UniProtKB/Swiss-Prot annotation:
Domain of life of the source: Eukaryota
One GO term of the biological process aspect: translation
Taxonomic source organism: Trieres chinensis
Lineage: Eukaryota, Sar, Stramenopiles, Ochrophyta, Bacillariophyta
Alphabetical UniProt keywords: Chloroplast, Plastid, Ribonucleoprotein, Ribosomal protein
Pfam families, A to Z: Ribosomal_L19
Xref: InterPro entries: Ribosomal_bL19, Ribosomal_bL19_CS, Ribosomal_bL19_sf, Translation_prot_SH3-like_sf
Main location (coarse class): plastid
GO terms for MF: structural constituent of ribosome
Protein name: Large ribosomal subunit protein bL19c
NCBIfam families hit by this protein: rplS_bact (TIGR01024)
Family: Belongs to the bacterial ribosomal protein bL19 family.
Length: 120
């Protein structure tokens, strides 16, 4: 069991490092994630666009798994939402899904992997 003082310190750290400007993201959304990349002494933002196939909610360790198909090859990346490397997250389109994890999209190709759009 953690002491009360230790728990307060952990809560303060969570409050300091959590981002406040994150839009509500659901499974099946098409998102555009801006990732900060440092090359030498230059810093730039590279955007990664794809479908959210999984989300793990764990306070400051919340992650998104985003999948896109690039030149016929499926590419998945896992992003820590509250990481300083993640610059921005923008929801481009919402889809109607009835699963919490969309791992079955890995086996679908072409038009079969499309999701039905939902207007919010």
């Amino acid at each position: 069991m953690l002491s009360l003082n230790t728990q307060k310190t952990i809560d303060n750290l969570h409050n300091v490092f959590t981002k406040k400007n994150i839009p509500p993201i659901r499974i099946g959304d098409n998102v555009k994630v801006g990732v900060r990349i440092i090359e030498g002494n230059k810093e730039r933002v590279q955007f990664y666009e794809g479908t959210v196939i999984a989300k793990k909610n764990s306070s400051i360790n919340t992650t998104l798994t985003v999948r896109k198909v690039l030149q016929g090859i499926g590419v998945e990346r896992i992003f820590l939402i509250h990481s300083p490397k993640v610059d921005s997250i923008e929801v481009l389109r919402s889809s109607k899904v009835r699963r919490s994890k969309l791992y079955y999209l890995r086996n679908l190709k072409g038009k079969a992997s499309r999701l039905k759009q939902q207007f919010r």
